[in-house]
Amino acid sequence: EGNSSYFLLAVSDDSDPNGSWNKYRINVTSFDSNIDSPNLAVDDEVIYLAADFFSPDSYLVLCVDKSDALVGDSLEITQVSLSGSGNQSLGLPVTWDANSPQYLIQSSEGTGNGVNFNEIRLWSIENPLGTPSMVSHDLSVPTYAYPQHPAQQGTSVRPYLFEPRFWSCVQRGGSVWAVHHVNSSRARVRWYEIDMQGWPDSVSTPQLAQWGEIDAGSDVSTYFPSIAVDEDGNAAICFSRSSSSEYISMCEVRRQADDPSGEFQPMNFVRTSTSPATTGRWGDYSGAAASANNSG
């Protein structure tokens, strides 16, 4: 709004989304005036709100007392921030594990040609409702690069993919599952399961348990993914795909917890466009969620 920055937060007063909602407008202009890419996560006690600010890259995380928001009271909020130099967009995993730290995840950025990145950065928020602080760990991963903007049938306009930033991640069963799009020659969805090893409270550090890419074949790009994981460790990824001979489609893939490591099952088409998208924007708020009633 003009030169001001706000988070808009809405919380239902019970499990019925058709009922009443408690709505908040949180002014963060004092941090910076050009908020972008808001993200949200929750755990047992805290609602976490994160966003990018671009003068220069910097990141703000608000820690909101969940009990206030559930009953519509004035919010008790603490905050922590960090510089974005060399890293991009804080992914905030929804936290299903009780008594677990809140983690965040960032991809690399900043090289002149946007290629040959080989790590991602993990953060843990300590004491979120007191005096919050953050500790980090850099995890080595297979090399990745900025994604190529994908072709689509019927137009020269290509959806803008930004960077290999993390918009979607889940914390469940002691792991963080995260997805982004990578590859400077043909964009592909990449996914990771990161075993957090109880970090930072343990003497161990996070380990890459498994990873993979969703490759739909020659000339087909996959991009803007979102991921969901259920209580049994089954996972699903929703994403877009297109090529010079395909309109943009919405697709999904799934894996069972006992499937071979690093593999998802064949993709399914959910919906296919019947004409090209010409605005230049597509899918950056893709979302996926596990059913609350059925696992698997």
Regions picked out by a protein language model, each given a short descriptive name:
Residues 1-296:
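C-terminal PAP-associated
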